[in-house]
């Protein structure tokens, strides 16, 4: 993951933090809570008005795209050759230009550490999510909070019915990049902060954990299928501590699905 500070050159104000997950080509922008509709980047003002400071990945990527040379530019091949690029890459162009464009005074600067406000906010990100019966989500968060949430109760989530009314879409649900959402069909993102804010700390029962084991613990073969890799690749990741088994067996290890997915980020 690469981390960039978004800074206003005129005021020197830290305007946001851009997280770029290179393996998936996914961007997430975190905004400081001191921003208002006048100091926030124009594209994000509607979110700031609603007190939403974690920008969805599609809107974050749109911010990147708006600041770089479009892929349809007539001389794009010459530009790619000039920068020794084999293919069009929005983030590469953003780094080359330092994120500067004519529409505002913002620029980006690569940093090594996440600011405290981002670290604190990420404690509400999702680690594991179990798709239980009756469209109920069992969500495990970074700060050890566990919530059991019925999709029908998320009235503020506009795309709720697209998930509820299509069982195939519902069953496709998984933890999204960085734990920022539960994503369905890779096209509908249910934000982690929205799930965390639900008043639903319902006591768990044994069946909840049985469902968890059934759906979220993978053996070596299932993990290889999910990552589309060989057993040798799996062994390499374990040796390099990129992946930690929850149980080691001679015939094959067991892994948490969330840990396996994180190797793709």
Language model features with spans:
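Broad phosphate/nucleotide-binding scaffolds in NTP-utilizing and phosphate-metabolizing enzymes
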Residues: 1-117
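A short, Lys/Arg-enriched interface patch at domain edges and termini
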Residues: 189-205, 258-265
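Polyanion-binding surface elements
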Residues: 209-231
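Residue-level detection of the helix-turn-helix DNA-binding "recognition helix"
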Residues: 239-240
